[in-house]
Amino acid sequence: MAEFEDQLVFNSISARALKAYFTAKINEMVDELVTRKCPQKKKSQAKKPELRIPVDLVKSSFVKKFGLCNYGGILISLINSLVENNFFTKDGKLDDTGKKELVLTDVEKRILNTIDKSSPLYIDISDVKVLAARLKRSATQFNFNGHTYHLENDKIEDLINQLVKDESIQLDEKSSIKDSMYVIPDELIDVLKTRLFRSPQVKDNIISRTRLYDYFTRVTKRDESSIYVILKDPRIASILSLETVKMGAFMYTKHSMLTNAISSRVDRYSKKFQESFYEDIVEFVKENERVNVSRVVECLTVPNITISSNAE
């Protein structure tokens, strides 16, 4: 750099030296920008109020144990905190009380009885949210305007028709061109949000029949969040260096471990999976299925048959 600066003389600058000087300076700045990790500005968003789970939708023995009966609704963050602070050992492993009182599948219980507590496969505090979510159950009905509506996955059309018949929602004929559009009052939206833990997607209190159908389909679908998953092939464990446990004919690993292992194969700059990883999993994941981590997890695992224990 000194040789370029020496060639810069006031009022007598060589064009070639000037070009070389600025090129070098620009290269330095670019290198600095690439190597420096600039903190991203967080979008300033108003924090949404946390939903309260109706007491009757939380496992009754859990409600009784922690004296939550008189609550107007229980924050999911409170449930998470109670689970983490009362059912785990000091080193973060699920304790014997948790095995008895929390909702575990039969497979999960068998795995816990097979492996050592020090194993990375053992249920730990990283699984708190899954265990806490299992303490709440989906509503089977909701009440509005003096009517009771039952939620059944195979009778959603009947449910929508009944809502229309009772005038709980009204057909908006002006907007109904390609699809039937309904006016849904704020009061009903509040009831659905409270009882079903999510709101329907509306705009100016208008919702299409298709979206309303999809909404009820989602909220009536059983939550099958898994702590352990079955690998399609033992070679997957070798490719991803996963800890596993064999139960009968199936090889299990923790869902969180599999997800983390796949996530680590994503290039931090291109946000795409590494080519070497593609080559390793090509037998199990088609090219059009390499969409994201969740999709790859689905392709590498066998759907679990979930049988819950300790449920009420």
Swiss-Prot record:
Cellular component annotations (GO), alphabetically ordered: virion component
A GO MF label: DNA binding
Keyword annotations: DNA-binding, Virion
Cellular compartment(s): Virion
InterPro entries recorded: Poxvirus_I1
The UniProt record lists the keyword DNA-binding: yes
Principal subcellular localization: virion
Induction of expression: Expressed in the late phase of the viral replicative cycle.
Note in the entry: Each virion contains approximately 670 molecules of OPG077.
Function, in words: DNA-binding protein which binds to the hairpin form of the viral telomeric sequence. Required for the production of mature virions (MV).
Family under the similarity heading: Belongs to the orthopoxvirus OPG077 family.
Official protein name in the record: Telomere-binding protein OPG077
Native organism: Vaccinia virus (strain Ankara)
